[in-house]
């Protein structure tokens, strides 16, 4: 029902992680992760949520000092009481590497396509298959997976 925004961020200041409140922005340093307060608050909300959609990493996870937000968001999704949908190639890889795949409702390597599908937009690949089925008078039967 709500969109929760970060209250702080982590900037990369000469290679060091510096947490800043949103009110302290802008600064002349790149923002590389969520701040610690945001990580705690978002983790709590994710664990209590009915549905979680996580599309892409929370920060520059390739750098150890800036991977915390991404790792903690994934951990919270794995512990959520609700349904967790993960989208994006980086996210899918991290979920798999951390052995969390079986704790997620669905993991999609297509980040943008996943969001397009959720939004009800036409997916070009699916549309092409539907047109082909019509052209060759084939019936498409959806396959429903039981939990």
PLM-predicted stretches and their roles:
Residues 1-147:
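Active-site loop-to-helix "anion-binding N-cap" substructures in soluble metabolic enzymes
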């Amino acid at each position: 029902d709500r969109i929760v925004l970060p209250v702080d961020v982590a900037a990369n200041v000469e290679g060091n992680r510096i947490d800043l409140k949103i009110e302290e922005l802008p600064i002349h340093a790149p923002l590389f992760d969520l701040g610690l307060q945001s990580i705690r608050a978002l983790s709590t909300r994710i664990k209590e949520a009915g549905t979680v959609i996580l599309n892409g990493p929370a920060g520059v996870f390739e750098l150890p000092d800036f991977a915390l937000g991404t790792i903690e968001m994934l951990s919270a999704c794995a512990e959520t009481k609700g349904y967790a949908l993960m989208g994006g190639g980086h996210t899918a890889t991290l979920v798999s590497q951390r052995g969390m795949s079986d704790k997620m409702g669905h993991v999609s390597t297509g980040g943008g396509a996943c969001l397009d599908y959720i939004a009800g937009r036409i997916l070009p690949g699916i549309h092409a298959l539907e047109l082909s089925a019509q052209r060759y008078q084939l019936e498409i039967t959806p396959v429903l997976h039981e939990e």
